[in-house]
Amino acid sequence: MSEPASISTGIAARYATAMFELAEEAKALPALEKDVDALDAALSESADLRDLIHSPIYGRDEASAAIGGVADAMKLQDMTGNTLRLMASKRRLFVLPALLSELRERIADHKGEVTAEVTSAKALTKTQLDKLTKSLKAQVGKTVTVKETVDENIIGGLIVKIGSKMIDTSVRSKLNALQNTMKEVG
């Protein structure tokens, strides 16, 4: 059974807060970041792992043992493995992708970093990326990591998302705005 997104986000946020604070106290944030990266990669690559976290056919004990085995095989920190086992015993593994996202955000914020999702019609050159990164850093006052995607449908320009803010300078959005203006006039 699928949970509403807000419930999943809330659950993930609580687990993320606990894990982040424990790792911060133990001065183990770099290790936690490695665990997050490893789990994220494993989720991307393994259909079996995705099935384990989403499928209701696995009982609490089975899921806990399976995710514990995964954590041990991946040599994750004890705290991460124990959290995954706890999540399995509480039938909360379905929030793992949201948990990883929350942890990634908290770690980046702690390091003074922010991720900008940039969509362009064509791949940006190294020079363009450097200029954009420098400009965004000046705007937000933090180190900016650019996650670039290409979408030819925007025709030209950029769409930049940083957190909840979005700057849309795409030709597509300008054409849509012009079309809406013309509808109002006519």
UniProtKB/Swiss-Prot annotation:
InterPro entries: ATP_synth_OSCP/delta_N_sf, ATPase_OSCP/d_CS, ATPase_OSCP/dsu. One of its GO terms (molecular function) is proton-transporting ATP synthase activity, rotational mechanism. It is found in: Cell inner membrane. It is a peripheral membrane protein. The keyword Transport applies. Keywords: ATP synthesis, Cell inner membrane, Cell membrane, CF(1), Hydrogen ion transport, Ion transport, Membrane, Transport. Its main location: membrane. GO terms for cellular component: plasma membrane; proton-transporting ATP synthase complex. F(1)F(0) ATP synthase produces ATP from ADP in the presence of a proton or sodium gradient. F-type ATPases consist of two structural domains, F(1) containing the extramembraneous catalytic core and F(0) containing the membrane proton channel, linked together by a central stalk and a peripheral stalk. During catalysis, ATP synthesis in the catalytic domain of F(1) is coupled via a rotary mechanism of the central stalk subunits to proton translocation. Belongs to the ATPase delta chain family. This is ATP synthase subunit delta. It comes from Jannaschia sp. (strain CCS1). The lineage of its organism: Bacteria, Pseudomonadati, Pseudomonadota, Alphaproteobacteria, Rhodobacterales.
